[in-house]
């Protein structure tokens, strides 16, 4: 066992995890996706071919590669290539509008773009700095076909691997998304020996930080099969678990809720007893939902608390959580967390304050090309995600709110300023304040409170027109689910809209405001 852990760590340190597993069990299926399968040997060979392609086209270590791709084998192949070729990979959310995807591809300084061309965001984005465009799936003008290109290169292991990095984008509080750049993510990958029958399910989009880490990267590291689903279907997920005898998965609370909403006779149709480990995070989970899941699948549900920027190692098992419902885990190291008031002073045990985490010495983060935002997120050797919480007498952390303006809907982070910036371009809108309001299924939903320009009056028809206009400029999940018109918005003495005051009435009477 120790020998295998050592081999895993050494392979991960150079980005060669699939090379290790190609040697150990090369003919074992590594990827099941909705249209194809790949063995560990095939994934490894494709990764080597992609590296050789990128090198031939002039990319050097540290250069950026953008990947706009659904949950399919090619996503893993390009990821594996960047990990061993020394490239900085940015997965792009394929739900984004053309303008949003275009901004990220350009902002990350991508020199190569691998894209599934069924998405308009891939084919219509203007990306003049990209020198290599590779189509996954259907061909498209201006793109070179993935399979045809790879066939021109040797699949044998490269002899000079250098571990790469990744940069994920998080929506910006002032409008544009920001790249969260962590230079040494390989240093965060902890080796773990899998059971011989382990199978991982990736039920969320692989471009998202949590599925990328807990489903894709962990299965790569441990050498276990990964089952991809492209779109969520509650009963379909149960069928996949039964068919592939899935043992592990990362899920988010809205997935729990949708599974629990299935009729009991439907849930009983499928054997999910193979499940041994479920991990969840990304959004607060209502205690009654989590308790119902534990009652159904057993005490196999583990919760973590962290962000793309990092965290303090909070994780809580089902057994612990049942004694402390609502907690996100016990403080693993007193030096890893500080809870501060608005003046930067430590709060007393039991009092809420802004959470600050110690910066990882292994993989510190920066907001790409934004030193001001990087500095604003830090206090010395600590940084904040903008969350508010407290530690109880036993050292368990409970979240109570957020100082940041982030909306978390179905586990997806949405920053309202980005929405406001688009809504005020509508001819009827004078000003906008977008907030998250309670939603029993999604946790929060997007609501925009608007003031109107002279000559316009609030109406259902105008609200629908503004929503339709927003759909042309924003990803669907950012479009306000509801719109309210008001005569004025509360402002600070400096004239800034006080989003917190707009939000408060919708959360009145609730134990927490997230």
Language-model features, listed with the residues they occupy:
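AMP-binding/adenylate-forming catalytic core of the ANL superfamily
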Residues: 52, 75, 96, 113-115, ...
